[in-house]
Amino acid sequence: MLHVLASLPLLLLLVTSASTHAWSRPLWYQVGLDLQPWGCQPKSVEGCRGGLSCPGYWLGPGASRIYPVAAVMITTTMLMICRKILQGRRRSQATKGEHPQVTTEPCGPWKRRAPISDHTLLRGVLHMLDALLVHIEGHLRHLATQRQIQIKGTSTQSG
């Protein structure tokens, strides 16, 4: 439980938005890295048409946008917390000498059901992350077609 409390300030830093004067672009712009998967960086601010890479898009005044990376980090953190809780339950049952009872009734009480395996839990989280990435990709493609922004890897050859 102490690990969870220690990670709360980090989660709060990820969720809260910074001032627009301090960070007008995501962190990878500040350090000069090209980590954007959609790659729509304008040559200059004047050529910016309000796209994803424009200053102020990610952290605008009053905006509460959250980075997709932060969403994945929060999901991963929650998965780790759930895993620790499940491990603690299993350890406490093992020290008491109790074994989980398995019932064939689908509507039996929750305590009588077999515990969910780590494989099943991990599979569910991976499906959730996959759905999140598909949603982000669809949103970025929609923005690219809406604003005529060229996506990295696609070429517009004429002739």
From Swiss-Prot:
Region described as Disordered: 91-110
Coiled coil: none
Membrane topology: Single-pass type I membrane protein
Main location: membrane
Assigned keywords, A-Z: Membrane, Signal, Transmembrane, Transmembrane helix
InterPro entries (alphabetical): TMEM89 (IPR028069)
Record has tRNA-binding as a keyword: no
Residue ranges that the UniProt entry lists as topological domain Cytoplasmic: 87-159
The UniProt record lists the keyword Transmembrane: yes
Protein source organism: Homo sapiens
Protein name, as recorded: Transmembrane protein 89
Compartmental location: Membrane
TM helices/strands, residue ranges: 64-86
Extracellular-side segments: 25-63
GO cellular component labels: membrane; nucleus
Signal peptide interval: 1-24
Domain of life of the organism encoding this protein: Eukaryota
